[in-house]
Regions:
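A short hydrophobic/aromatic micro-motif that marks alpha-helical segments and, especially, helix-coil
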Residues: 322-323, 382, 469-471, 477, ...
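Charged catalytic and DNA/RNA-contacting regions of genome-maintenance
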Residues: 1-337, 342, 349-362, 366-452
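Alpha-helix boundary/capping motif
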Residues: 450-451, 455-457, 463, 470-471, ...
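Detector for intrinsically disordered, low-structure N-terminal pre-sequences
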Residues: 9, 199, 460, 465, ...
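Intrinsically disordered, low-complexity regulatory regions of eukaryotic regulatory proteins
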Residues: 4, 390, 425, 454, ...
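Glycine-centered signal
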Residues: 263, 434-437, 455, 467, ...
Length: 492
């Protein structure tokens, strides 16, 4: 491949960005298409069964290209992620009309199998977890390696659920079968010590530094000390947590504002099941074929995807604590005795996936229709909360407290959003009339509803925006449409 300096300006920009993400496919926005280039194009063409073409030449060679329309990008992303690929999404962030050279572009996020948050890319009834594995000490002989401490941290980015556990090398396969991560991060120097079915990403060994991990964890949780979380003095756990958080933050190009706590799991909390036992019990995966019966399919009558995912988690984590199991039984008994189960189930059927919407809000990637779904769900949640308040069980009371929401949240969303907003601001209107006077004026201008007084006001506004007194902005209404004319001020 020619060196970047020999390429056209657009391809120089592409190669600079690609050099920052050498190990993932680069989805490069060009107008109404996302394009792959060079080796990425050849690989994507095979994986997606799309046409491999060439677009002109750069650096003295033809440029291999393969692209998909922006409107169908989600379905192609889903296929790539299902195949274990990671994709960097490079968007146009500059204005093409104002750009003298290539339009400014930036990678806004990296989509990987373990960091999915888009509803269209996620299974409704299963979580996608990202795990990081830290080995305490260098590789030695196999007998000693089996007794070494291994730290595992995992994060479900679509809900903000961060957990960690400490095990030994010989117990690692059983723990991975329990956690079932969609992607694993491991140090480059430890890659040969890990045999896993999930896609594995390697990072430099220093990403697994325990002191760095402690600092990243304190910053993420907003605390001065980690004493309350039970990780101090456990270097393998701290190393795994630090590498996990660093990788997740890098993929999102955003703070993980919804990740606010850490739960440490102990092998003594649950009934121990090795990988073979889990498979033979057919808890969630059938022995023969993808469509075979499983215990999960038999039991799953949940009204929401959130409930189905919780049930799946419980099946893989059978409790040893009789008190915790009894608390669940008490709530179920109270629901049945009060005859509330059908009413609550019906109410839940109209509740969207709040876990995933909340995560996307925190990551600043929520779509308008998701916010509208949240707005419409809030009154239903309050009705469910009142129904649960009638149940006299400790676990039910804790649920009632957890469901308390800010009083003005629904009013704010109702006042801000249209009843049926567009899928995205590019597709149409999102904000309700009356929320922002300036936006209302611009909509009136777009619709051609502007008169002489409005034209004068628009002229003054535009002069302030331009910041020059030698520019004249004039508005004229012609055939129901408004035209803005910009020209030099004449000397008086």
């Amino acid at each position: 491949m020619p060196t970047p300096v020999e390429h056209t300006p657009v391809m120089q920009q592409y190669l600079r960005i690609k050099a920052q993400y050498p190990n993932v496919l680069l989805f490069y926005r060009m107008g109404d298409f996302f394009e792959f280039g060079y080796e990425d194009a050849e690989k994507a063409a095979k994986l997606l069964n799309i046409t491999l073409t060439s677009r002109g030449s750069s650096g003295g060679a033809r440029v291999a290209m393969a692209g998909v329309p922006v409107v169908s990008v989600d379905q192609h992303l889903a296929r790539l992620v299902k195949l274990g690929e990671s994709v960097a999404i490079c968007e146009q962030i500059g204005d093409p009309a104002a750009s003298k050279g290539p339009v400014e572009r930036k990678v806004v996020r990296v989509v990987t199998p373990g960091t999915l948050t888009d509803t269209g890319l996620l299974a409704d009834k299963a979580d996608a977890a990202l795990a990081a594995i830290a080995f305490d000490g260098p590789a030695r002989d196999a007998r000693r390696d089996r007794r070494d401490a291994v730290g595992i941290a995992w994060l479900v980015l679509a809900s903000g659920d961060l957990r960690a556990t400490e095990t030994t090398a010989d117990r690692l396969p059983s723990e991975l079968a329990r956690i079932a991560p969609s992607e694993i991060v491991v140090a480059e120097g430890a890659r040969e010590r890990l045999a896993a079915a999930a896609p594995v990403q390697t990072v430099p060994d220093w990403h697994f530094d325990a002191q760095r991990g402690a600092q990243l964890l304190r910053e993420q949780l907003g605390v001065a000390t980690l004493q309350a979380f039970g990780v101090e003095g456990r270097p393998a756990l701290l190393a795994a947590c630090g590498a996990l958080l660093a990788y997740a933050q890098q993929t999102q190009s955003e703070r993980l504002a919804h990740v606010t706590t850490l739960r440490i799991e102990s092998e003594s909390d649950f009934v121990a099941l090795d990988a073979v036992t889990r498979r033979n019990l057919e808890l969630t995966e059938p022995l023969r074929g993808d469509d075979g019966p499983t215990l999960f399919k038999v039991l799953d009558r949940c009204a929401t995807g959130m409930g189905s995912r919780r049930l799946r988690h419980w099946l893989h984590h059978p409790l040893r604590d009789a008190g915790a199991a009894s608390a669940r039984h008490a709530v179920i008994e109270s629901l049945l005795d009060a005859g509330l189960a059908p009413r609550i189930a019906e109410g839940l059927r109209h509740v969207p996936d709040l876990d995933r919407i909340a995560a996307r809000v925190a990551l600043k990637s929520a779509r308008p229709r998701e916010l509208a779904a949240l707005r419409d769900a809030l009154p239903r949640l309050e009705a469910l909360r009142r129904a649960l308040a009638a149940i006299d069980a400790p676990l039910a009371r804790s649920l009632v407290d957890a469901m308390a929401l800010p009083a003005d949240l629904h009013e704010t969303l109702a006042r801000t959003l249209l009843a049926e907003p567009a899928h995205s601001p590019r597709d149409g209107d999102v904000i309700a009339a009356g929320f922002d006077p300036e936006l209302d004026e611009l909509r009136a201008l777009r619709a051609g509803h502007v008169g002489g007084g409005d034209a004068d006001r628009l002229q003054r506004v535009d002069l302030r925006r331009v910041g020059r007194d030698d520019v004249a902005v004039r508005a004229a209404v012609e055939h129901g449409r408004t035209a803005l004319r910009v020209g030099q001020q004449r000397e008086q």
